[in-house]
Amino acid sequence: MQFSRTQETAADQAAVTLLEANKISARGLLSFLRKFEDQDLLSPNRQDPYTRSHPLTIARIEFVTNHIETSEFSQNSASVRDLEAHARLRAKLVGFLQPVEQILRLYPVENQSIPARYARAIGYYRESDISSALREIDGLIAEQSGDPYFHELRGQFLFEGGKLEEAWPSYELANKLLPEDTLLMCELARLEIEIGGNQLINKAVTSLERVVVHEP
């Protein structure tokens, strides 16, 4: 998909507006854009795929630079919470997008941080090593039992591994921890329909009716 310069300008404007509203510096955005600055000089077959589909112009870098010069939040540092969330998001992307060999190079088993175990759990699951995936995710749940996304991921491992009844408690708990999340409602409803039985199907219908109310 090709993105026009107009689309990229609109995206940049939306990005800095969102950052400003949350009192976050745009220095990270500028650093990201500069990583691709030299890509324009390369032949198309040597360019990063992102650069080929997302035009990078001097104007984009100048726009973000000007914003940084005028924003009162440009010297703000990322909070510990934001850094932790970023590390976890990066681990999730690596887990779902990279080969397991690359995952284990980036997050070796000696690394027992939450992002590392998260990435390995997803990587093992993609390799159909459900027992290793469950070992990693169960360890995370033992430490952070109130995290709905860990329970959701555990449910996904079991559901897609054909263990529908075993998956249900994990999805049910994820929904209880995050009751207004319509995506979780849909996932739970799908599982309940797959399992079958009047009670679960009726429950699934109720959940889907709530989804329609939230997102008509």
Which residue stretches match the model-derived regions?
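Extracytoplasmic and endomembrane cell-envelope/extracellular-matrix remodeling and assembly machinery
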Residues: 2-183, 191, 206-207
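Short, structured loop/turn "capping" segments at alpha-beta junctions
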Residues: 184, 199-200
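Short coil/turn and helix-start
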Residues: 127, 197-199
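Short, intrinsically disordered, charge-balanced linker/junction segments flanking boundaries
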Residues: 209-216
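Glycine- and small hydrophobic-rich membrane-insertion segments that are intrinsically disordered
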Residues: 1-2, 198
